[in-house]
């Protein structure tokens, strides 16, 4: 389950009186007058009326009516002239001296005010995420967050292999030289060249223009490509037009082939120009393209005119070839391709998926018609129904196996290994060509037993080379990843036999192991320690036996880039580990160059650097986000406080506390707890982000706290796997313990604590409210929540919960079903899209039924018609966060505050303002009294 990308409007900030010793701009003469009046009133309550009266009289125009009650005794009676008495000279001299001192002090203060620049609503200093206070600037607004105002600019480099054996080539789109251009990264002049030292034999390669214009003509029609993939020899380009989105990653489109030298265009499917193709991939030799159409797999051979070979023939609604079905796309492959060419182009491996026994789930569309088909006459009023093969826990999974196509012989075959998992208990997560062999990873359906299988297609044999019982190791599960990398033998480089590098469990943490020979079940450990690698390896330099990876070695909430030798020696950072940082990285085809993306905690930037793999020194900043830095100076961003919280239950969790820009420890603040909490997820990081949480802290003036409870990632396996078979239960305990800790702090209002989340975070919100039963949290907001894990997909759920048949008590304990306990909170909000193909609307409806049965009424619901898990149809995403309309603005003073309950922003403000308590027990107005008053 991946959180949707969502990854906010101006709201009135609560006014607070603050006295700053550093800025005269924070105190006006008027405020001092009011303070003085208030002091006198506090001393003598009887004077309050006259003080107010004097202030009022000072604002009246001449000729305003004054009644006798507005005159004081010292003024004399109306109509009686005032009797003036001469002032003592000594007293007058003292007053003059005091006045002169006051004027001098005022002028001095004015000079300091002007010279210090305190009148400017910005800071001249660089954004400091560790600052303990903020300057006088603008608040973060919801419009800024939704409009991309705070989005860091970044360049996505598409590294591309050099057919001539070089390195550092990238594919640029929309350059001055042409629409598709292959450039040498060293020749890119769009950045600041900070360091560049290279020899004559390492000079940048000349650019190659693959496509001049951003469109092409075919049969007299202008077509604009929406996707492209150059052939490995860079002589042709696959172009896709008319994309139609399917699921999270997949789409179908019409494909064309561009011949670079002649600019000739031809359709991928010669006899069906407008064919809708689901996937197309180049062969390594650039002489063929495999593609899937109507769930069957084909090969288009380019060395023969109009030569299309259909490899499979039984593809259709229940059989998929070369592409994943819904659950494999979402939970296993995390992509749209299930086709793998051998390095020599002689074999094509592809996944066959049999969904015959998988139950269907129907999704109704009330507004739109995703199929694009017009309803039959007379049936226009009926919703369109889309049926998805969606396996739920305990139901039939799709049956998958890998098939192979021998290009020279033209035959298709399967290869089974002795003792591999049976059809009903098999998940295939990895397919990797290792020379002329294939490495497969299979696990059982609950994901706690892994088998690595080595397949030899030429001999048509397979054997299991490694079996890992993860349930026996730590009681947890196998984490799916797609970074396993083949290491070919090269005696000249000290590699006597083939092998591979992969992430393995080592002493309670995830580290990198090197398996050689390739059938050796015991790896050479390249990393170790009380820290973890992430999606490792990032790249492998075969020329220098170097493995590059990203890890949490410095801190669990930071990411730095490192290299290590294949023998486990010489672990070296590529990034500056003496300074806090969260880096992402991508490498060129031969690992000689890297795109470093610094993502925080300071303003993000990107630079291309040379690596230890090449003998030159190169560094160029390609994005410094100077504009974002300037915005940060001019705005009051939240104060960020990171740390480790020791909970009473003995558990340590990372936390992030976002404080209002002018945090006052003497005030009492409400807290919004924001979280996701899913297995191996991480929300507390050192990334720079200005988002909805930032808006809440900056503009609404609330505290926003996030913790990563047990079950989340990068604190070791034991911290993570302890939640197995009982999702949500321990996490709820941790959130409640954290909230109780905060409730005890002097600057927190314990009566105003709320929690919110989306997807898994929505589930965790409701589960926490249920377990807490109103003891700690008063409010909660859940978006697209799971409420019973029996309703989610099988592959994700069973990995953490096992089968319902084997863990019925665990499923019951995890489900949100105690409506009475849930109703003990002051109020909660549920939001869901009716066409959610991921977390079905069924989840929220089941919970609503529990609430009806228990007669619980202190909640609100907002359903978004035809929205999926991201809730975006017809502008719904903005509505999730803020639903204030012109109608509600104009008439909210007449109507109930229920009018603006739907958006998270408005709902939260109503909650912390106590509005929901006012309507908790509504009473009818006495009509007799109303008539009497009128």
Curated annotation (Swiss-Prot):
Keywords: Aminopeptidase, Glycoprotein, Hydrolase, Membrane, Protease, Serine protease, Signal-anchor, Transmembrane, Transmembrane helix, Vacuole
Enzyme Commission designation: 3.4.14.5
Main location as per UniProt: membrane
Biased composition (Basic and acidic residues): 36-62
Region of interest: Disordered: 1-81
Pfam families: DPPIV_N, Peptidase_S9
A GO CC term assigned to this protein in UniProt: fungal-type vacuole membrane
InterPro entries: AB_hydrolase_fold (IPR029058), Peptidase_S9_cat (IPR001375), Peptidase_S9B_N (IPR002469), Serine_Prot_S9B/DPPIV (IPR050278)
Subcellular location: Vacuole membrane
Residue intervals passing through the bilayer: 94-114
Keyword Membrane annotated: yes
Biased composition (Low complexity): 15-32
One Gene Ontology term of the molecular function aspect: dipeptidyl-peptidase activity
Catalytic activity entry: Release of an N-terminal dipeptide, Xaa-Yaa-|-Zaa-, from a polypeptide, preferentially when Yaa is Pro, provided Zaa is neither Pro nor hydroxyproline
GO biological process, one term: proteolysis
Residues in the Cytoplasmic compartment per record: 1-93
Residues annotated as catalytic: 759 (charge relay system), 836 (charge relay system), 869 (charge relay system)
Membrane topology according to the record: Single-pass type II membrane protein
Record family assignment: Belongs to the peptidase S9B family.
Physiological role: Type IV dipeptidyl-peptidase which removes N-terminal dipeptides sequentially from polypeptides having unsubstituted N-termini provided that the penultimate residue is proline.
Annotated protein name in UniProt: Probable dipeptidyl-aminopeptidase B
């Amino acid at each position: 389950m991946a959180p949707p990308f969502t990854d906010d409007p101006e709201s009135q900030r609560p006014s607070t009186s603050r006295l700053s010793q550093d800025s005269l701009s924070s105190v006006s003469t008027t405020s001092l007058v009011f303070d003085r009046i208030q002091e006198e009133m506090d001393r003598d309550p009887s004077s309050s009326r006259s003080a107010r009266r004097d202030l009022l009289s000072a604002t009246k125009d001449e000729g305003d009516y004054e009644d006798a009650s507005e005159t004081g005794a010292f003024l004399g009676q109306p109509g009686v002239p005032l009797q003036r008495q001469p002032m003592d000279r000594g007293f007058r001299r003292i007053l003059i001296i005091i006045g002169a001192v006051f004027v001098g002090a005022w002028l001095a203060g004015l000079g300091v005010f002007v010279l210090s620049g305190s009148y400017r609503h910005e800071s001249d200093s660089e954004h400091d995420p560790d600052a303990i206070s903020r300057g006088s600037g603008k608040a973060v607004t919801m419009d800024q967050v939704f409009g991309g105002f705070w989005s860091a600019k970044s360049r996505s480099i598409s590294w591309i292999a050099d057919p001539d054996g070089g390195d550092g080539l990238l594919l640029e789109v929309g350059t001055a030289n042409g629409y598709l251009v292959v450039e040498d990264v060293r020749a890119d002049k769009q950045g600041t060249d900070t360091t560049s030292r290279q020899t004559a034999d390492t000079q940048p390669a000349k650019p190659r223009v693959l496509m001049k214009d951003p469109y092409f003509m075919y049969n007299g029609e202008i077509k604009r490509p929406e996707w492209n993939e150059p052939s490995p020899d860079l002589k042709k380009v696959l172009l896709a037009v008319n994309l139609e989105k399917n699921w999270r990653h997949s789409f179908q489109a019409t494909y064309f082939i561009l011949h670079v030298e002649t600019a000739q265009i031809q359709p991928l499917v010669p006899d069906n120009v407008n064919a809708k193709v689901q996937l197309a991939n180049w062969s390594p030799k650039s002489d063929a393209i495999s593609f899937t159409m109507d769930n069957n797999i084909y090969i288009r051979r380019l060395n023969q005119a109009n030569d299309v070979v259909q490899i499979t023939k039984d593809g259709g609604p229940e059989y998929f070839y070369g592409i994943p079905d819904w659950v494999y796309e979402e939970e296993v492959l995390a992509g749209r391709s299930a086709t793998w060419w051998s390095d020599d182009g002689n074999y094509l491996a592809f996944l066959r998926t049999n969904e015959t026994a998988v139950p269907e789930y129907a999704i109704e569309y009330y507004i739109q018609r995703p199929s694009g088909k017009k309803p039959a006459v007379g049936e226009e009023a009926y919703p369109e129904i889309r049926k998805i093969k969606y396996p739920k826990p305990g139901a039939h999974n799709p049956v998958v196996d890998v098939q192979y196509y021998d290009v020279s012989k033209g035959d298709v075959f399967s290869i089974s290994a002795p003792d591999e998992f049976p059809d009903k208990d098999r998940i295939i997560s990895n397919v990797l060509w290792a020379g002329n062999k294939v490495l497969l990873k299979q696990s059982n359906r609950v994901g706690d037993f892994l088998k690595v299988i080595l397949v030899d297609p030429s001999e048509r044999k397979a054997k299991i080379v490694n079996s890992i019982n993860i349930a026996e190791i730590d009681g947890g599960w196998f984490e799916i990843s797609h970074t396993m990398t083949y290491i070919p033998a090269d005696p000249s480089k000290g590699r006597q036999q083939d092998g591979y590098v992969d992430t393995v469990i080592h002493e309670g943490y995830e580290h990198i192991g090197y398996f050689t020979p390739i059938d050796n079940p015991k790896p050479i450990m390249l990393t170790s320690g009380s820290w973890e690698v992430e999606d490792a390896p990032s790249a492998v330099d075969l020329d220098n036996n170097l493995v590059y990876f990203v890890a949490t070695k410095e801190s669990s909430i930071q990411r730095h880039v490192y290299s290590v030798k294949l023998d486990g020696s010489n672990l070296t950072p590529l990034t500056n580990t003496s300074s806090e940082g969260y880096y992402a990285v991508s490498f060129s085809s031969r690992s000689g160059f890297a795109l470093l993306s610094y993502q925080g905690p300071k303003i993000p930037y990107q630079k291309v650097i040379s690596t230890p793999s090449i003998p030159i020194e190169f560094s160029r900043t390609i994005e410094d986000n100077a504009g974002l830095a300037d915005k940060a100076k001019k705005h009051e961003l939240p104060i960020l406080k990171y740390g480790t919280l020791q909970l009473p239950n003995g558990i340590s969790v990372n936390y992030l506390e976002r404080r209002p820009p002018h945090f006052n420890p003497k005030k009492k603040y409400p807290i919004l707890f924001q979280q996701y909490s899913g297995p191996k997820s991480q929300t507390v990081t050192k990334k720079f982000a200005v988002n909805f949480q930032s808006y809440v802290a900056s503009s609404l003036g609330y505290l926003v706290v996030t913790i990563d409870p047990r079950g989340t990632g990068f604190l070791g396996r034991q911290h993570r796997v302890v939640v197995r078979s009982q999702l949500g239960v321990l996490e709820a305990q941790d959130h409640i313990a954290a909230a109780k800790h905060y409730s005890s702090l002097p600057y927190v209002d314990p009566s105003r604590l709320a929690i919110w989340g989306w997807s898994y975070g929505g589930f965790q919100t409701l589960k926490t409210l249920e377990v807490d039963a109103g003891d700690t949290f008063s409010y909660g907001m859940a978006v697209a929540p799971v409420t019973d894990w029996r309703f989610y997909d099988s592959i994700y759920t069973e990995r953490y919960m096992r089968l319902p048949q084997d863990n019925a008590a665990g499923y019951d304990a995890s489900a949100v079903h105690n409506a009475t306990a849930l109703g003990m909170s002051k109020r909660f909000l549920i939001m869901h899209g009716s066409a959610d193909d991921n977390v079905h609307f069924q989840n929220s409806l089941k919970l609503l039924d529990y609430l009806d049965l228990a007669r619980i009424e202190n909640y609100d619901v907002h359903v978004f018609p035809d929205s999926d898990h991201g809730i975006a149809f017809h502008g719904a995403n903005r509505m999730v966060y803020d639903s204030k309309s012109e109608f509600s603005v104009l008439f909210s003073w007449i109507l109930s505050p229920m009018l603006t309950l739907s958006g998270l922003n408005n709902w939260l403000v109503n909650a912390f303002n106590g509005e929901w308590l006012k309507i908790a027990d509504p009473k009818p107005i006495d009509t007799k009294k109303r008539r009497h008053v009128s």
